[in-house]
Amino acid sequence: MIQKNWQELIKPNKVDFITHGSRAHATVVAEPLERGFGLTLGNALRRVLLSSLRGAAVTAVQIDGVLHEFSSIPGVREDVTDIVLNIKEIAIRMEGEGPKRMVVRKEGPGVVTAGDIQTVGDVEILNPEHAICTLDEGAEICMEFTVNTGKGYVPADRNRAEDAPIGLIPVDSLYSPVRKVSYKIENTREGQVLDYDKLTLNIETNGSVTGEDAVAYAARILQDQLSIFVNFEEPQKEAPQEQVAELAFNPALLKKVDELELSVRSANCLKNDNIVYIGDLIQKTEAEMLRTPNFGRKSLNEIKEVLASMGLHLGMEIPAWPPENIEDLAKRYEDQY
């Protein structure tokens, strides 16, 4: 009864991921959804996508000859404030955890771009064409960047360490790899019902993560956060018991002859004649058994006595023997004989 609260709600029978020629843009379409669930899920996913996914960003910069962000640099057209604003827009992918250091050195004339930055092994600049500043003839600039990982938006004053050296300028850090998210809700049909929701999410990232992966991470975050509110255990479905097909012969015939507690001589004779199962044995006649090397009348009588105690005898005919899956059948029926 309880599980009907969620089991009988309709769930999307398909989720389409549409790329637009790059990692940075994607459209996600999910349908059908219960009426109102498009807005519920769309709004929740959008908020998590924008605020809660981890990424990498520049947290501070140190420029040779500059003591604070209100300085100007000879031969550089932009002042330090504008340079810092441009640094904030550098898109970075970093595999490991920070902090890491990056350096750029360049002489003018020319434009200093993000592609001029010398990165370490697990740091990648995703928008190398992004302009940082412009140098005049004879001008030179050297900057060292601190890169770290985090989530959301962290203002510059929180990136300022108490023991920061003079000249280290903190930078506002936008860690989120997701730049824009929008969604729309449309009507869709399922069978004869016309008032279900269709959710379309449009996602733009900085390229460090695909739109499809970003949605997957956001959904996982929501799943983890909501699980704490579930205060009951779901009833377990009983697995249907496997139906064992009836055999065309006595299951005791699947027992191996080495379990019959025969004398060593008799057991060795059967082994040498490739008689493995009782079903193999009882199909033999007395004459066939006596033709077995080293098999005498004493061994024959011993075997006849053991078989008689099981209601069996030599020379029996068994339909459908040996079965193709004899080893599997022997394991399945071993508790029944």
UniProtKB/Swiss-Prot annotation:
A Pfam family hit: RNA_pol_L
Gene Ontology terms: biological process: DNA-templated transcription
Keywords: DNA-directed RNA polymerase, Nucleotidyltransferase, Transcription, Transferase
GO cellular component, one term: cytoplasm
InterPro entries: DNA-dir_RNA_pol_insert, DNA-dir_RNA_pol_RpoA/D/Rpb3, DNA-dir_RpoA, RBP11-like, RNAP_asu_C, RNApol_insert_sf
EC class: transferase
GO molecular function, one term: DNA-directed RNA polymerase activity
EC assignment: 2.7.7.6
Span list, region Alpha C-terminal domain (alpha-CTD): 249-337
Catalytic activity, as annotated: RNA(n) + a ribonucleoside 5'-triphosphate = RNA(n+1) + diphosphate
Region annotation (Alpha N-terminal domain (alpha-NTD)) ranges: 1-233
Function field: DNA-dependent RNA polymerase catalyzes the transcription of DNA into RNA using the four ribonucleoside triphosphates as substrates.
Subunit and partners: Homodimer. The RNAP catalytic core consists of 2 alpha, 1 beta, 1 beta' and 1 omega subunit. When a sigma factor is associated with the core the holoenzyme is formed, which can initiate transcription.
Family membership noted in the UniProt record: Belongs to the RNA polymerase alpha chain family.
Stored HAMAP family: RNApol_bact_RpoA
Domain notes: The N-terminal domain is essential for RNAP assembly and basal transcription, whereas the C-terminal domain is involved in interaction with transcriptional regulators and with upstream promoter elements.
Protein name listed in UniProt: DNA-directed RNA polymerase subunit alpha
